[in-house]
Amino acid sequence: MPKLEQFEIKKYWQIFSGLKPIENKVNHDQVLPILYNSKLDSSVLNKIWFLADIDDDDNLDFEEFVICMRLIFDMVNKNISSVPDELPDWLIPGSKVNLIKERKKRKQIENADLPPKKEIKVDWYMSPDDLNQYEKIYNSCAKLTDGTITFNELSTKLSTKFFNISKTDLNKVWSLINPQNLPSIDRDPTFYFIHCLRQRNDLGAEIPASLPNSLAEVCNKKQLSYDLRSSQPPTKRKEEANEVDNLRDNGQNSSSDSSGSNVLSNEDSIKQKYASLTDDQVANMREQLEGLLNYKKSEKTQGGSKLSKRINIRSITDDLDNIEQQVEVLENYLNNKRHELQALQAEIN
C-alpha cells in the first residue's frame, strides 16, 4: 500500500471543504454520499469508519477524513483486498498516536472481560414499536402496481439504515422469506425481512436456515394473479356454475334454487376462510380484490380488443360476481371487527 502523497492530501482537503464541516468536523450523514458512491459493501464501510474515527466521537476531523478516504480508494482501486484490523503506522497522524494506544488497551480489556460468545437466534416476535418502524420503511419504498416491493428497492433502502449487514446477509434473508423466489414480496414478508436483518445488524443474530411453520405459511401464500391469460385450472365454483348453465339451457327451472344454495354455501366458506385474518390482512386483501374487480370490469367493457374475444364472457361475469361477493363479506367482517374494538375500548374507558 503506497504511502500518502501531498497531492492526495490536497484532493482530500477539497472534498472535505465541500462537505461544509462544522467546527472542522463532518458527521456520518455528510460523508454518506461518498460512502454510498464507492459501491463497497456496508460491512466494509462500517469497518473503515470505525478505524478512521480514532477518538470515537462519531465525527471525522480532517486527519480522520484522510484516513477514511485513503482506505476507501485503496479498496475501490484494489490496492488492498480487505480492510486491515488496525491502521498501519504510516497512516496514523502524529497527533493521534496516543489515542490509538488507548484504543488498543481498551480493546484488550474489553476482550478479556467478555464471556464466550453465544449464538444469538432471531426472535420473530415484533413489538408494536417494531411494527411502527417497519411500517414507515415499507411506506417509504417504491412499490409495483400490485403493491409488492422488489429486492433491489428493499436492499437499497436498508443498506442506508443497517451498516453491519453484508450483501450475503441480504440475499440469504431474501431467500429465507421468499421461498417461491418471486420477483417481489408483499407487506407481511417485507416486515419479516426487515425484522430479521435488523437483529442481524444490531445483535449479530444468526440467519436461520428455515422459518417457523406459522411464518412459512405467511411467506408461502400465493399472490393474487391479475393475468386473464393465466393457465390456472378451472375452480370448482366455475364447474358448478357451468352445470347450472347447462340445466338452464335444457329448460330445467330448478337450477335457480341450486344456484342460490351454491351462493349461500360459497358465502359461508368465505366467512370461515377469513375468520382468522387480522384487520390489516383484511384491508390488504380487500384492496387486492377491488383492484382485480376494477380490472375485470374494464376488460369486460373493452369488448373490441383481441384479448376479450378469446375470453368467455360468462366466466368473466362469474368472476365479477364472486369477487363482489368476497368484497362484501370482507367489508362486513371488517365492520364487525371495528365494532368489537370500539366496544372493548368503551369497556376499558
Curated annotation (Swiss-Prot):
PANTHER family: EH DOMAIN. InterPro entries: EF-hand-dom_pair, EF_Hand_1_Ca_BS, EF_hand_dom, EH_dom, End3. Residues 249-265 have a biased composition (Low complexity). Belongs to the END3 family. It is a peripheral membrane protein. Residues 96-105 are annotated as: Polyphosphoinositide (PIP2)-binding. Residues 40-75, 146-164 form the EF-hand domain. It is found in: Cell membrane; Endosome membrane; Cytoplasm, Cytoskeleton, Actin patch. Residues 236-248 have a biased composition (Basic and acidic residues). It comes from Saccharomyces cerevisiae (strain ATCC 204508 / S288c). Component of the PAN1 actin cytoskeleton-regulatory complex composed of at least END3, PAN1, and SLA1. Interacts with SCD5, SLA2 and YAP1802. Interacts directly with PAN1; the interaction with PAN1 is prevented by PAN1 phosphorylation by PKR1. This is Actin cytoskeleton-regulatory complex protein END3. GO terms for molecular function: actin binding; calcium ion binding; protein-macromolecule adaptor activity. Residues 276-334 are annotated as: 2 X 20 AA approximate repeats.
